[in-house]
Amino acid sequence: MVKLRLKRYGKKRQPSYRIIAIESKSRREARPLEELGYYNPRTKETVLQTAGLLKWLRCGAQPTETVDSLLKKAGIYEMLKAGEGGVVASIRIPAMAKPEAGIPEAAEEAPATESVAEAEVADVPESELSEAATETAAAELSPPEAEVEKPQVEEAVEA
């Protein structure tokens, strides 16, 4: 039976783990069938290769409790139920960092300018936007009438 479990690496008292697919009877440090991501418990950073995880879960691999909780947080089981076949190559779950005093102020200012521009565009109905776009496109494509000289055609009338 194939298990999805953690393989420890890193310095003493600074563990990091690789998420691997391995035979259940193999020891922890044995050569894995496939490496499927990593997990750092100190920074809570996790990177998962969804295509590989979905493949092994479909084949019947059993995750350990820790790997199971990581897969739930990343939404792998929802992808498996929905039938997505590795649409996303990998998922990065960033660490939960505590915001500093100066960072939230800058973060609040930046979205405010973006929302003003979005509000201006949102106020104009979609039909007016499309009409205005076609008028400007037509004006750009056709030269002004003053510059274009139309040849006058004289029709000869035979008597």
Swiss-Prot record:
Entry GO terms, CC: cytoplasm; small ribosomal subunit
Parts forming coiled coils: none
Gene3D superfamilies membership: 3.30.1320.10
GO molecular function: structural constituent of ribosome
Region Disordered, annotated ranges: 102-159
Signal peptide span: none
Sequence ranges of Low complexity compositional bias: 102-119, 130-145
Matching InterPro entries: Ribosomal_bS16 (IPR000307), Ribosomal_bS16_CS (IPR020592), Ribosomal_bS16_dom_sf (IPR023803)
Superkingdom assignment: Bacteria
Record GO biological process: translation
Keyword Ribonucleoprotein in annotation: yes
Start-end of Acidic residues biased regions: 120-129
Positions of disulphide bridges: none
Keyword Transferase: no
Keywords recorded for this protein, A-Z: Ribonucleoprotein, Ribosomal protein
Listed HAMAP family: Ribosomal_bS16
Family (UniProt): Belongs to the bacterial ribosomal protein bS16 family.
Official protein name in the record: Small ribosomal subunit protein bS16
Gene name of this polypeptide: rpsP
